[in-house]
Amino acid sequence: MKLVIVSGRSGSGKSVALRVLEDLGYYCVDNLPLPLIGTLLAQLKGSNDLVAISVDVRNIAEQGKVLQDQLALLENDTEIISFFLNSNDKVLLKRYSETRRLHPLSKNHISLQEAIKLEGRLLEPIAKIVDHYIDTSALNIYELSDQVRQILLGSVDKELVINFESFGFKHGMPTEADFMFDVRFLPNPHWEIELRPFTGLDEPVQEFLGRQPLVNKFIWQIENLFETWMPHLERNNRSYLTIAIGCTGGQHRSVYIADQLAKRFRQGSKHTVNARHRELNISDTNN
């Protein structure tokens, strides 16, 4: 079993780190009371071996060394990784001013600046013993996510679900697309009377479009575009990438091209690649 503990000053990005862990398959609990760590792991053992908890100043301040005592009681086969997130006082003041959230120590009737400084003093013993200390002062949420992911996986690459979706413009454009390509300029099988009843998934249409230099060039260029930029899309903290291909009716050209792109991206890909043909009401899911 692996236990990841995320601590740090309020406003430094603990919730961002916890969301990354959740995306990686961890069972996450925010601000778990420290004496319940052992109970939580015992209940999850066998059903979920990846667990992450966040610990804030209210737990640390009130219970002192309870965290270390609780960790010492865990089974020997529990791998523990700890993070401490911090930012300088000026950045934390700015973040709190922008969000207008209450600081956890504000109940002590002290100013925000005093609460931030007090929290730093209370958490200092924890900051000295963690495995990974991350200063988030100059990081945005994507950069912080990348750092956490890289520490845990050794890589910032993230598995994506890539959806290729065909559609017809005359039926409306899809609203969920990240990228959209208009293929209405390509040769249209609709004007070949014998091909009109078929779709882009049928062999006669595939043979017709496969003979068209413009179609092949377009597919190659789209494939090359996403192969070039995929590493950067992986680092963009996204889980889904939807690429929409549109023709007039969503029956021939867009269907064929979306299908061909899905097949090409499935070859040797670590990502889940799906093809969906909206106007045909057909989905093809594969890894």
Swiss-Prot record:
This is Nucleotide-binding protein Sfri_3380. InterPro entries: P-loop_NTPase, RapZ-like, RapZ-like_N, RapZ_C. GTP binds at D56, V57, R58, N59. It comes from the Bacteria. SUPFAM superfamilies: P-loop containing nucleoside triphosphate hydrolases. The keyword Metal-binding does not apply. Displays ATPase and GTPase activities. Pfam families: PapZ_C, RapZ-like_N. ATP binds at G8, R9, S10, G11, S12, G13, K14, S15. Disulfide bonds: none annotated. Keywords: ATP-binding, GTP-binding, Nucleotide-binding. It comes from Shewanella frigidimarina (strain NCIMB 400). Belongs to the RapZ-like family. GO terms for molecular function: ATP binding; GTP binding. Coiled coil: none annotated. PANTHER family: RNASE ADAPTER PROTEIN RAPZ (PTHR30448:SF0).
